[in-house]
From Swiss-Prot:
It is a multi-pass membrane protein. GO terms for molecular function: glycosyltransferase activity; phosphotransferase activity, for other substituted phosphate groups; UDP-N-acetylglucosamine-dolichyl-phosphate N-acetylglucosaminephosphotransferase activity. This is Putative UDP-N-acetylglucosamine--dolichyl-phosphate N-acetylglucosaminephosphotransferase. Pfam families: Glycos_transf_4 (PF00953). Belongs to the glycosyltransferase 4 family. InterPro entries: Glycosyl_transferase_4. It is found in: Cell membrane. It catalyses: a di-trans,poly-cis-dolichyl phosphate + UDP-N-acetyl-alpha-D-glucosamine = an N-acetyl-alpha-D-glucosaminyl-diphospho-di-trans,poly-cis-dolichol + UMP. The chain crosses the membrane at residues 5-25, 46-66, 76-96, 102-122, 123-143, 160-180, 186-206, 222-242, 295-315. GO terms for cellular component: plasma membrane. It comes from Saccharolobus solfataricus (strain ATCC 35092 / DSM 1617 / JCM 11322 / P2).
Length: 322
């Protein structure tokens, strides 16, 4: 039964994500819902809203978890609803270009399902301080704050083919490993993370260099919120904090530009990326190390996140409540 609970969701997630992404590419081209790939010399137009494929695959796989693991009836609906709410807000942003000042605080509303289902635990084990019980403040402050940070921060470090999706796979892999080596809600959160990994992996086939589709804000907000929701639901707070260290750096770099900075680079005649101004992003710091192809910049950043993922797995010190 446990093997079925693992295999069925990941197979469904991958298959549904794949076929939905193919459909979205076709429909986006027909409706001219496209954006320019700035990091290419010829600036080709690429279909947007690829996040719809990711979401479809994840939801299909997660619902299958409800059929194979009846103990997850509280964790899975909370994670699905929170992620869907933030995805809807991202879709509105893609279509109507919501003001940044408004967009930054919209994820607060997406935290409501996590609060209603009372996922997570108010006792958080903090390195060097030990367990601290935040009581009611955990639900009215920490959960909304955490989901707002994870979704907004993840959306900042994007702009290169496959970058955000690959980072998401690495972060979710760490959470999945932690979850699947524990029991109770942490194990269930690990199953959800595993389903998300395969949904993202199917999408990465089309989003990797050279990209055939972009995730859009609907995709990046969804991935960020999903990572946050899984970390909260599975009591993996320490791991979540460590995994987001690169995004803290990205936030600081963007803050220096009043959040007007970009993550893409400039392209030379050979198709290599460079940046000759003050860095607005971690991508620019990598570009200043040498002139790399776009996929090389992405691989370097993936490698950096992989290091933090290993550290997160090693240092995870959550209090597991079954």
């Amino acid at each position: 039964m446990r093997i079925l609970a693992i295999l069925l969701p990941i197979l469904i997630s991958f298959f549904i994500s794949y076929i939905t992404t193919v459909w979205v590419i076709r429909q986006a081209k027909k409706s001219r819902f496209v954006g320019k790939d700035i990091n290419k010399p010829d600036k080709p137009e690429i279909p947007l809203l690829g996040g719809i494929g990711i979401i479809a695959g994840f939801i299909a796989g997660s619902f299958s978890l409800l059929l194979t693991d009846v103990r997850s009836e509280r964790v899975i609906p909370a994670v699905i609803l929170s992620s869907l709410l933030i995805a809807f807000l991202g879709l509105l942003d893609d279509i109507f270009n919501v003001r940044q000042s408004v967009r930054a605080f919209l994820p607060i509303f997406a935290s409501v399902p996590l609060i209603v289902y009372s996922v997570g635990h108010s006792i958080i084990s903090i390195p060097f301080l030990g367990p601290i019980n935040f009581g009611i403040f955990y639900y009215i402050i920490i959960i909304p704050f955490a989901l707002t940070i994870t979704s907004n921060a993840f959306n900042m470090l994007e702009g290169l083919n496959g970058l955000g999706v690959g980072m998401g796979i690495i972060m979710l892999s760490a959470l999945a490993y932690i979850g699947l080596t524990h029991t109770g809600p942490t194990y269930q959160a690990g199953l959800i993370a595993l389903s998300a990994i395969f949904s993202l992996s199917a999408f990465l086939i089309f989003n990797k260099y050279p990209a055939k589709i972009f995730p859009g804000n609907v995709g990046t907000y969804f991935i960020g919120a999903l990572i946050g929701a899984i970390g909260i639901a599975g009591f993996m707070y320490t791991a979540l904090a460590i995994l987001y260290i690169p995004y803290v750096v990205e936030f600081i770099l963007k803050l220096r530009t009043n959040f007007k900075g970009v993550s893409f680079g400039k392209v030379d005649s050979s198709g290599r990326l460079y940046w000759d101004e003050k860095p607005h992003s971690l991508t620019h710091i990598v570009m200043k190390m040498g002139r790399f192809k776009e996929y090389q910049v992405v691989i370097i950043l993936w490698g950096m996140e992989a290091i933090f993922a290993v550290i997160a797995v090693i240092l995870q010190t959550t209090t597991i409540v079954i």
